[in-house]
Amino acid sequence: MAKKVTAVIKLALQAGKANPAPPVGPALGQHGVNIMMFCKEYNARTQDKAGFVIPVEISVYEDRSFTFITKTPPASVLITKAAKIEKGSGESAKGNVGSINRAQLEEIAKTKLPDLNCTSVESAMRIIEGTARNMGVSISD
């Protein structure tokens, strides 16, 4: 018989830098999960993606064991890295803080495709383009 899931926890953590301090400790501690075991596994699985924020979905079971799935970095993080900017514009309609080209947009779309609710790279590119526009990043050809 399959183990019963008691909780699903979603966190966004720096790749390779998870530690028992907040937000990891309190989120996992209240469900009785071994925090250090999670931190070691997460850091080992994400060490090659250093510098990115990696979302993780942790399933906690009745016997206090857990499994987790790492997702792709948020589109906004990938866009800021590609545009070489610190952060997006506070007022996207007024300010243009940077730009990325179509090749960079396609690369980001291919990276995000497994986590997006679409099947083609073209539709993923439109989703990422909308995110970039809302951040004040323009798309150049």
Curated annotation (Swiss-Prot):
Keywords: Methylation, Ribonucleoprotein, Ribosomal protein, RNA-binding, rRNA-binding. Transmembrane segments: none annotated. Pfam families: Ribosomal_L11 (PF00298), Ribosomal_L11_N (PF03946). One or more lysine residues are methylated. GO terms for biological process: translation. It comes from the Bacteria. One of its GO terms (molecular function) is structural constituent of ribosome. The keyword RNA-binding applies. The keyword Repeat does not apply. One of its GO terms (cellular component) is cytosolic large ribosomal subunit. Part of the ribosomal stalk of the 50S ribosomal subunit. Interacts with L10 and the large rRNA to form the base of the stalk. L10 forms an elongated spine to which L12 dimers bind in a sequential fashion forming a multimeric L10(L12)X complex. Forms part of the ribosomal stalk which helps the ribosome interact with GTP-bound translation factors. HAMAP family: Ribosomal_uL11. Belongs to the universal ribosomal protein uL11 family. This is Large ribosomal subunit protein uL11. The lineage of its organism: Bacteria, Bacillati, Cyanobacteriota, Cyanophyceae, Synechococcales. The gene is rplK.
